[in-house]
């Protein structure tokens, strides 16, 4: 990742700490992966703290595929089968079947409805019957170990939410340009500045976690 582009957002450690602080205060963050991987930026929110306004922003400026990043424990609690038995996607993105809240929604498409679905899925006492399948929210199963196991947006979202003191669940959506193309680092940074969102890279987060674990050992 071009560090010059990211210089306005601080050092790698500062970028992670600012992202954690933003989530802790109910704001969103932009998460970039490596230029040799997807080379995309995702809007990321802590699932527990996301607002309808933030969901509307996500739908308006994103790909439309709003994903709920959850642990495998939560996936099993909700009895969500994986979308396919044999995952042949390039980066092994671990989609489950899509979901909709069983109660409190209309068509399930609106910002409010999608947030209702997310809240139903992350509730402490959530059970499989709280969700209908299919729906308009796309759960993603994170790998145990987070970004230290897989350097994906899914794991970064869960790690950041956890570091901010929330349940291990994040909401993400890929940022797109006005013409429908995918936003890369320059456009992601421009969007982040416009919407007062920190920018952090997955590599930043992995290095931060490795450093924290070394200190703890």
Swiss-Prot record:
This is 3,4-dihydroxy-2-butanone 4-phosphate synthase. The gene is ribB. D-ribulose 5-phosphate binds at residues 37-38, 42, 150-154, 174. It comes from Yersinia enterocolitica serotype O:8 / biotype 1B (strain NCTC 13174 / 8081). The record marks 136, 174 as: Essential for catalytic activity. Keywords: Lyase, Magnesium, Manganese, Metal-binding, Riboflavin biosynthesis. Binds 2 divalent metal cations per subunit. Magnesium or manganese. Pathway: Cofactor biosynthesis; riboflavin biosynthesis; 2-hydroxy-3-oxobutyl phosphate from D-ribulose 5-phosphate: step 1/1. Pfam families: DHBP_synthase (PF00926). It is an enzyme of class 4 (lyase). GO terms for cellular component: cytosol. Belongs to the DHBP synthase family. Homodimer. Mg(2+) 2 binds at residues 38, 153. Its EC number is 4.1.99.12.
